């Protein structure tokens, strides 16, 4: 019984010892990149080292220093060479027994460099400390879904636990890794980045990286508007967005995927002109550009047009007007106005709101072209549209390849429309081409076997109008068919009603009820299997009268009355006046008005509605004179300006100077200039007249005074003197004087900034109040002399001239007195220098002589002492010798 009790006690003690040899659960670890410590509670076992077993190679032991005070703290400095070794397949410690270190006591890994794997996944670098404290092959991602990040080469002898590769799975956005000790690490995949944005007519292609695959939803916004998920497709490297922008504009695009936001990027929707017509080199004309985004998003139409600049080569095309989002017009001046303008391959530049097109479109003068898609055939009169069609006398027309003489050929002044009656011999297909100035156009084919004509009545803008069309060459199989008209832009179909009993079945008239509309409409007429093209033009607006009302010198209005059509279409109307397109703020069917503003001038006023223009009304605005400016005159003349308001190019004004009339130049509606190339220096009075003599006056041209800035260097011997400055005049009467006494002769004008003359030698008697002493305060070399330069009525005076002190040569007897004086001054200077030298010698001698005497005395004393010592020595030697001899 006692033995059994003893065994139980021993087993209990042994088990108790085992428990108390384990590390207390309250132990905790503190670590950073250079430090690792374990904190053990009071009465707990502790360890002073950790042992790391590796897959390959020897194990590594990390030793700690331990301090016991209110528990025990064991710590170790973690040096760079140690960081690479503290990892292992097994980590153990020993007290009285060896134990495996619990994962809760692993230090939390420290990631020291940014860790943002690509969304495609793949190889990334992980850097830090304690990253693989317990040697492993992967990290566990727990959010947003469970995935593994694999550690590469962890079993290799060359494995660096502070810097190694990991293989990441595809992912997106924020992720969470759970470390071995239970702590969490947040990281995110790379943010999306945009490298290239390509804008197409119907989509935007965004190329970049890290957009995440299609399994992750994205929020894409353009100017804050969310793009629906159904309107884009994406992968990690690109996004294709279905998007159409009709205007030239800068927009902001933001891409957000899985709560990761890219940098907001500006995308620019640039104008893209694709087609341009041609105009004659000698005339210029209206250019029509067609393409994409040919308008701004400005709601004010006037501001929209003000922000449009079109350049053909280096020429600015004036009065640019955005007709629609796809079309712009402007007026191009004749090419011969600028001799540097070439005929061909001029680049077209369209700038809207400071945004310029990038695509390449070239313009060529004088390209003869027929438009195959725009023609009409009323009553066998073929009406063609095109470019550079020439004139009725010079254009050659080819029908079916043969030159055809046409007596009724009509071509408008702009060379854009051509019409003629088709000769009777042509019955079916007609091939048409023209030749202008030996340039042959393209050839177009027209079916003339079936055509139509209509009455002169215009469809109304206010209501339905019956218009009678007569159809010709109707085929027999179509006799009983009901004809129809299709208004092409709106695709409105109107059926015709017969208006007469046919006497000839192949020619028949029908009435068509045309609905209210606006502008010119292309139509297609169909009967059975036959069709042809034609057009109808709605009511043409009429201007009866226009006047300027209520102008007080600053404000006023232009008011017009007439017949302007249906009020419902007036929103599509505008006024062309003074090279501007104006939207009248006040308008109804009979009246419109708009403000009179600076920049307007007398001009033809045209009202247009839906592209149909009224006949021009000549509106006269009395010009207003506000002032003149002749301040920009220089030595050779300059500009004279008449300033005011409402000037036109044909305003009558003139300037007379010295009974000569000078030609005006119209600058703009506020400025007229005159180039008065009248050389100075003598001021003159001129006369101007303005607005047919309603205002006259005199003005004086005052030329600037000359300004002397510098002269060349010259000595008293005289010689060529160059004078530099500004505002010199090329006149015969030029005078140059020094100190009001010495006159310069042989004066020569060089340019507006310099002249030369010969200055005679200096004569002392002329300067009776001065002495020619180089170092005297009264010498002519020590101060600047008065220089006078006169160009007829203009004089400059100033103390700027000074003689040079350079060596003076005896060139003639007139210089002897000067040279004698100079030599006298030099002799005086030499005497002064000698006197100064004597004084210096005396001072030096008084210092050196006593020193020399002291040196001699000292030397004598030294010699005397030496002699005495020798005498004494010789005496001592003699006495010794005597004693030796005695011995």
Curated annotation (Swiss-Prot):
<feature type="glycosylation site" description="N-linked (GlcNAc...) asparagine">
    <location>
        <position position="325"/>
    </location>
</feature>
<feature type="glycosylation site" description="N-linked (GlcNAc...) asparagine">
    <location>
        <position position="775"/>
    </location>
</feature>
<feature type="glycosylation site" description="N-linked (GlcNAc...) asparagine">
    <location>
        <position position="186"/>
    </location>
</feature>
<feature type="glycosylation site" description="N-linked (GlcNAc...) asparagine">
    <location>
        <position position="338"/>
    </location>
</feature>
<keyword id="KW-0325">Glycoprotein</keyword>
<dbReference type="InterPro" id="IPR014756">
    <property type="entry name" value="Ig_E-set"/>
</dbReference>
<feature type="glycosylation site" description="N-linked (GlcNAc...) asparagine">
    <location>
        <position position="354"/>
    </location>
</feature>
<feature type="glycosylation site" description="N-linked (GlcNAc...) asparagine">
    <location>
        <position position="32"/>
    </location>
</feature>
<protein>
    <recommendedName>
        <fullName>Tiger protein O1</fullName>
    </recommendedName>
</protein>
<keyword id="KW-0472">Membrane</keyword>
<dbReference type="GO" id="GO:0009897">
    <property type="term" value="C:external side of plasma membrane"/>
</dbReference>
<feature type="glycosylation site" description="N-linked (GlcNAc...) asparagine">
    <location>
        <position position="588"/>
    </location>
</feature>
<feature type="glycosylation site" description="N-linked (GlcNAc...) asparagine">
    <location>
        <position position="393"/>
    </location>
</feature>
<keyword id="KW-0677">Repeat</keyword>
<feature type="glycosylation site" description="N-linked (GlcNAc...) asparagine">
    <location>
        <position position="70"/>
    </location>
</feature>
<keyword id="KW-0812">Transmembrane</keyword>
<keyword id="KW-1133">Transmembrane helix</keyword>
<dbReference type="InterPro" id="IPR052014">
    <property type="entry name" value="Dictyostelium_Tiger"/>
</dbReference>
<feature type="topological domain" description="Cytoplasmic">
    <location>
        <begin position="867"/>
        <end position="887"/>
    </location>
</feature>
<feature type="signal peptide">
    <location>
        <begin position="1"/>
        <end position="21"/>
    </location>
</feature>
<feature type="glycosylation site" description="N-linked (GlcNAc...) asparagine">
    <location>
        <position position="652"/>
    </location>
</feature>
<feature type="glycosylation site" description="N-linked (GlcNAc...) asparagine">
    <location>
        <position position="259"/>
    </location>
</feature>
<feature type="domain" description="IPT/TIG 2">
    <location>
        <begin position="710"/>
        <end position="767"/>
    </location>
</feature>
<feature type="glycosylation site" description="N-linked (GlcNAc...) asparagine">
    <location>
        <position position="629"/>
    </location>
</feature>
<feature type="glycosylation site" description="N-linked (GlcNAc...) asparagine">
    <location>
        <position position="219"/>
    </location>
</feature>
<feature type="glycosylation site" description="N-linked (GlcNAc...) asparagine">
    <location>
        <position position="687"/>
    </location>
</feature>
<feature type="glycosylation site" description="N-linked (GlcNAc...) asparagine">
    <location>
        <position position="720"/>
    </location>
</feature>
<feature type="region of interest" description="Disordered">
    <location>
        <begin position="811"/>
        <end position="835"/>
    </location>
</feature>
<dbReference type="Pfam" id="PF24612">
    <property type="entry name" value="Ig_TgrO1"/>
</dbReference>
<feature type="glycosylation site" description="N-linked (GlcNAc...) asparagine">
    <location>
        <position position="314"/>
    </location>
</feature>
<feature type="glycosylation site" description="N-linked (GlcNAc...) asparagine">
    <location>
        <position position="207"/>
    </location>
</feature>
<feature type="glycosylation site" description="N-linked (GlcNAc...) asparagine">
    <location>
        <position position="816"/>
    </location>
</feature>
<feature type="glycosylation site" description="N-linked (GlcNAc...) asparagine">
    <location>
        <position position="710"/>
    </location>
</feature>
<feature type="glycosylation site" description="N-linked (GlcNAc...) asparagine">
    <location>
        <position position="811"/>
    </location>
</feature>
<feature type="domain" description="IPT/TIG 1">
    <location>
        <begin position="277"/>
        <end position="365"/>
    </location>
</feature>
<dbReference type="GO" id="GO:0031152">
    <property type="term" value="P:aggregation involved in sorocarp development"/>
</dbReference>
<feature type="topological domain" description="Extracellular">
    <location>
        <begin position="22"/>
        <end position="845"/>
    </location>
</feature>
<feature type="transmembrane region" description="Helical">
    <location>
        <begin position="846"/>
        <end position="866"/>
    </location>
</feature>
<dbReference type="GO" id="GO:0098742">
    <property type="term" value="P:cell-cell adhesion via plasma-membrane adhesion molecules"/>
</dbReference>
<feature type="glycosylation site" description="N-linked (GlcNAc...) asparagine">
    <location>
        <position position="788"/>
    </location>
</feature>
<keyword id="KW-0732">Signal</keyword>
<feature type="glycosylation site" description="N-linked (GlcNAc...) asparagine">
    <location>
        <position position="730"/>
    </location>
</feature>
């Amino acid at each position: 019984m006692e033995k059994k009790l003893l065994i139980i006690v021993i087993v209990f003690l042994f088990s108790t010892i085992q428990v108390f040899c384990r590390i207390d659960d309250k132990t905790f670890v503190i670590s950073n990149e250079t430090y690792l410590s374990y904190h053990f509670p009071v009465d707990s076992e502790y360890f002073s080292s950790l042992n790391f077993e590796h897959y390959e190679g020897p194990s590594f032991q990390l030793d700690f220093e331990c301090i016991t005070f209110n528990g025990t703290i064991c710590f170790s400095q973690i040096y760079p060479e140690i960081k690479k070794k503290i990892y292992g397949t097994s980590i153990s410690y020993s007290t009285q027994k060896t134990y495996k270190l619990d994962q809760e006591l692993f230090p939390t890994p420290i990631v020291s460099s940014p860790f943002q794997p690509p969304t495609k996944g793949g190889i990334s670098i992980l850097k830090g400390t304690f990253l693989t404290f317990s040697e492993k092959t992967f990290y566990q991602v727990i959010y947003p879904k469970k995935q593994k990040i694999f550690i590469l080469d962890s079993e290799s002898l060359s494995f660096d636990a502070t810097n190694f590769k990991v293989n990441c799975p595809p992912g997106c956005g924020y992720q969470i890794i759970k470390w071995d000790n239970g702590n969490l690490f947040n990281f995110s995949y790379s943010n999306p980045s945009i490298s290239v944005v390509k804008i197409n007519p119907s989509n935007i292609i965004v190329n970049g990286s890290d957009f995440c695959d299609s399994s992750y939803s994205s929020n894409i916004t353009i100017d804050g508007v969310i793009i629906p998920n159904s309107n884009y497709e994406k992968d990690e490297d690109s996004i294709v967005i279905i998007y159409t922008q009709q205007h030239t504009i800068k927009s902001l695009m933001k891409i957000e995927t899985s709560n990761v936001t890219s940098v907001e990027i500006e995308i620019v929707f640039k104008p893209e002109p694709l087609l341009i017509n041609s105009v004659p080199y000698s005339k210029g004309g209206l250019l029509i550009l067609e393409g994409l985004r040919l308008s701004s998003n400005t709601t004010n139409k006037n501001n929209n047009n003000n922000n449009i600049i079109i350049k053909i080569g280096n020429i600015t095309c004036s009065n640019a007007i955005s007709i629609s989002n796809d079309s712009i017009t402007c007026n191009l001046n004749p090419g011969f106005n600028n001799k540097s303008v070439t005929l061909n391959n001029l680049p077209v530049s369209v700038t809207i709101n400071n945004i310029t097109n990038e695509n390449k479109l070239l313009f060529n003068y004088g390209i003869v072209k027929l438009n195959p898609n725009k023609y009409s055939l009323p009553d066998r009169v073929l009406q063609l549209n095109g470019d550079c069609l020439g004139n009725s006398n010079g254009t050659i027309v080819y029908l079916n390849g043969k030159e055809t003489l046409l007596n009724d050929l009509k071509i408008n002044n702009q060379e854009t429309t051509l019409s003629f009656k088709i000769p009777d011999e042509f019955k079916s297909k007609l091939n048409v081409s023209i030749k202008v100035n030996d340039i042959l156009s393209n050839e177009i084919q027209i079916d003339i076997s079936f055509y139509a004509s209509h009455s002169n009545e215009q469809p109304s803008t206010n209501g339905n109008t019956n218009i009678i069309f007569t159809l010709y060459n109707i085929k027999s199989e179509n006799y009983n068919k009901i004809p129809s008209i299709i208004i092409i832009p709106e695709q409105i179909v109107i059926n015709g009603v017969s208006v007469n009993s046919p006497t000839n079945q192949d020619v028949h008239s029908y009435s068509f009820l045309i609905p209210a509309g606006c502008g010119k409409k292309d139509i297609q007429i169909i009967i059975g299997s036959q069709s042809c093209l034609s057009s109808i033009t709605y009511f043409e607006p009429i201007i009866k009268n226009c006047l300027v009302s209520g102008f007080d010198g600053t404000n006023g209005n232009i008011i017009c009355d007439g017949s302007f059509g249906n009020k419902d279409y007036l929103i599509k109307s505008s006024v062309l006046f003074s090279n501007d397109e104006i939207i009248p703020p006040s308008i109804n069917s009979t009246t419109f008005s708009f403000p009179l503003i600076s920049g307007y001038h007398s001009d033809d006023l045209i009202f247009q509605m839906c592209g149909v223009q009224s006949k021009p009304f000549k509106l006269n605005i009395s010009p207003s004179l506000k002032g003149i400016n002749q301040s920009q005159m220089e030595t050779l003349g300059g500009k004279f300006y008449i300033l005011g308001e409402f000037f036109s190019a044909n305003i009558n004004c003139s300037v007379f100077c010295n009974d000569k009339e000078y030609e005006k130049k119209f600058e703009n509606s506020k400025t007229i200039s005159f180039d008065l190339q009248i050389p100075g220096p003598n001021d003159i009075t001129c006369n101007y007249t303005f607005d047919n003599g309603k205002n006259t006056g005199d003005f004086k041209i005052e030329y600037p005074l000359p300004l002397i800035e510098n002269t060349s260097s010259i000595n008293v011997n005289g010689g060529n003197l160059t004078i530099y400055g500004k505002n010199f005049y090329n006149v015969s009467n030029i005078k140059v004087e020094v100190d009001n006494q010495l006159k310069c002769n042989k004066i020569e004008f060089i340019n507006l900034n310099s002249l030369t003359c010969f200055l005679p030698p200096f004569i002392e008697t002329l300067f009776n109040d001065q002495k020619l002493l180089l170092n005297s305060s009264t010498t002519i070399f020590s101060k600047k002399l008065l220089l006078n330069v006169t160009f007829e009525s203009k004089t400059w005076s100033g103390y700027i001239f000074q003689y040079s002190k350079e060596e003076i040569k005896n060139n003639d007897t007139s210089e002897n007195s000067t040279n004698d004086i100079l030599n006298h001054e030099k002799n005086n200077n030499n005497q002064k220098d000698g006197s100064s030298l004597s004084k210096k010698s005396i001072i030096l001698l008084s210092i050196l002589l006593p020193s020399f005497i002291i040196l001699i005395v000292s030397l004598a004393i030294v010699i005397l002492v030496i002699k005495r010592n020798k005498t004494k020595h010789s005496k001592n030697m003699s006495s010794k010798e005597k004693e030796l001899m005695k011995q």
